[in-house]
């Protein structure tokens, strides 16, 4: 047994010391950062891989805002892949492999495709895959005969463009012909791509969106540590997942190291995020195993009780600082996961060495989270829960089994999370705007124009509990 001599600190133990600054406006400050060495973000915020935080809608909103969402793993492989594909199909400049049907297919066929893929229009081709028409939801609106051939209901004489048509030319063609979809074809008239008005408008509305190399929204997905998870990884990567997050509470474990090594060997190009750890040694082990980024945080989350139940963890500021000290030398980003309650905490985490922060409860109350709405005493809330809570574990076992969980299994489980509710907060876009604005204010007080500068220039001062109370509104009635 030994006791470490240093006092471990968390965000409420410190403040950033204001410094002489030449920053004129916080709006000019850059919040660009990296999730992994190959994935750039415009804001350093990641939505947590929790089943009350991130599914399709949250992932889309996060990517559009310049961050990224990590779709949780507590669903079937097929459903998780479907969620990823929905994100990928939400917007893109060119749809490289557009959906198509043949002119000999039926109205029933196209309706099934539209329902399965959330697509509003399907290109129709002949037996040689040459474009001959297009069917949109408008064409199907009053069509009652599901057996009719698409050749009878499709819009013919479709306007097309060459495969190499750029965005400017495509926009001009769409405007000239007053159409919403522009199929791209090769010299033989065969379908090679698709450009839509909807996607062009989204490009302009979200200029800082996080995109992959093909112009699609970026998204991550979580997996477990069982060897069978390699199949899940394969399917997720095939669907276009940009980052694989290995998701267990105690990441500094043999199981985690082995699964990261296996993924790296099987899928060398995959971007792998390991976690969670709370020490420099744990961080280094995951880096040595092949992790491209490391998630730091054992027990700081608002719905996590690991430190109470297991007596294990490291206060989050110290955990981030010590982990970043080893990771930054190797160009590996740190994700500070948990304990973030305010924009000031985001600034402190980045100053301590984190490249991004992962948020759970702060985002669980938004429109885009999959949590259930509840009303209590006239106020609206959404459900939030730790993924190690009793109910989350019961639900997980029910999904993995035959839908039933034995009383013995329930009694044997020791919960390290709680089920809770958080106030309804409206759109995640507004929550992110407030957080990023506060972060930029913190940067200005430390004379930092970039997040890297914030880390380099930051000076922390410790404070007493009285200092913390002084930091909050006091001696007044807050309206």
Protein language model regions, located:
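Catalytic cores of alpha/beta
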Residues: 57-60, 231-239, 278-296, 336, ...
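Glycine-rich phosphate-binding active-site loops on the catalytic face of alpha/beta enzymes
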Residues: 64-79, 241-253, 292-310, 340-374
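Active-site-adjacent beta->alpha loops and helix N-cap segments on the catalytic face
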Residues: 75-85, 143, 147, 190-210, ...
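Alpha/beta catalytic cores of nucleotide-metabolism and tRNA/nucleoside-modifying enzymes
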Residues: 1-22, 162, 222, 289, ...
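Bateman/CBS regulatory modules and CBS-like beta-alpha motifs in cytosolic regions of diverse proteins
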Residues: 25-42, 48-50, 79-119, 124-126, ...
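Terminal amphipathic helices with adjacent charged low-complexity linkers/tails
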Residues: 73-87, 124, 128-143, 174, ...
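Catalytic beta/alpha-barrel core
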Residues: 71-74, 100-101, 121-123, 160-162, ...
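Short beta-strand/loop segments at the ligand-binding rim of alpha/beta enzyme cores
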Residues: 40-46, 93-98, 212-222, 263-278, ...
């Amino acid at each position: 047994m030994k006791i470490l001599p240093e006092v471990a600190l968390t965000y409420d133990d410190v403040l950033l010391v204001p410094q002489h600054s030449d920053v004129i406006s916080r709006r000019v400050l850059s919040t660009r950062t990296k999730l992994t060495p190959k994935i750039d973000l415009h804001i350093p915020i990641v939505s947590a891989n929790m089943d009350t935080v991130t599914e399709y809608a949250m992932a889309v909103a996060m990517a559009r805002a310049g961050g990224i969402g990590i779709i949780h793993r507590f669903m079937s492989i097929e459903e998780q892949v479907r969620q990823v594909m929905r994100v990928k199909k939400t917007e893109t400049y060119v749809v490289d492999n557009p959906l198509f049907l043949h002119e000999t297919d039926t109205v029933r066929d196209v309706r099934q495709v539209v329902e399965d893929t959330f697509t509003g229009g399907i290109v129709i081709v002949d037996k040689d895959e040459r474009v001959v028409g297009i069917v949109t939801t408008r064409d199907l609106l009053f069509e009652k005969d599901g057996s009719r051939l698409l050749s009878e209901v499709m819009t013919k004489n479709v306007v097309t463009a060459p495969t190499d048509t750029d965005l400017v030319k495509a926009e001009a063609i769409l405007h000239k012909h007053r159409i919403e979809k522009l199929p791209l074809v090769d010299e033989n008239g065969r379908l090679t791509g698709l450009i839509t008005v909807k996607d062009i408008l989204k490009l302009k509305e979200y200029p800082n969106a996080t995109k992959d190399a093909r112009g699609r929204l970026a998204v991550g997905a979580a997996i477990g540590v069982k060897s069978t998870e390699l199949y899940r990884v394969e399917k997720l990567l095939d669907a276009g997942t940009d980052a694989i997050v290995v998701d267990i509470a105690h990441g500094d474990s043999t199981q985690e190291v082995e699964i990261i090594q296996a993924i790296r060997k099987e899928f060398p190009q995959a971007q792998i995020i390991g976690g969670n750890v709370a020490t420099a040694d744990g961080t280094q082990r995951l880096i040595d195993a092949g992790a491209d980024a490391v998630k730091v945080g054992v027990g700081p989350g608002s719905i996590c009780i690991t430190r109470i139940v297991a007596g294990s963890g490291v206060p989050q500021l110290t955990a981030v600082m010590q982990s970043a000290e080893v990771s930054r030398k190797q160009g590996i980003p740190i994700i500070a996961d948990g304990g973030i309650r305010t924009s000031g905490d985001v600034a402190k985490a980045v100053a301590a060495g984190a490249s991004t922060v992962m948020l759970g409860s702060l985002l669980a109350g938004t429109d885009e989270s999959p949590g259930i709405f509840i009303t209590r005493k006239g106020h609206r809330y959404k459900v939030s829960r730790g993924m190690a809570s009793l109910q989350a574990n019961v639900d997980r076992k029910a999904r993995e089994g035959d839908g039933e969980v034995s009383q013995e299994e329930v009694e044997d489980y020791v919960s390290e999370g709680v089920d809770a509710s958080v106030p309804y907060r409206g759109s995640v876009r507004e929550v992110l705007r407030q957080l990023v604005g506060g972060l930029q204010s913190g940067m200005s007080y430390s004379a930092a124009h970039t997040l890297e500068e914030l880390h380099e220039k930051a000076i922390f001062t410790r404070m007493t509990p009285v200092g913390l109370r002084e930091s909050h509104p006091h001696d007044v009635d807050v309206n």
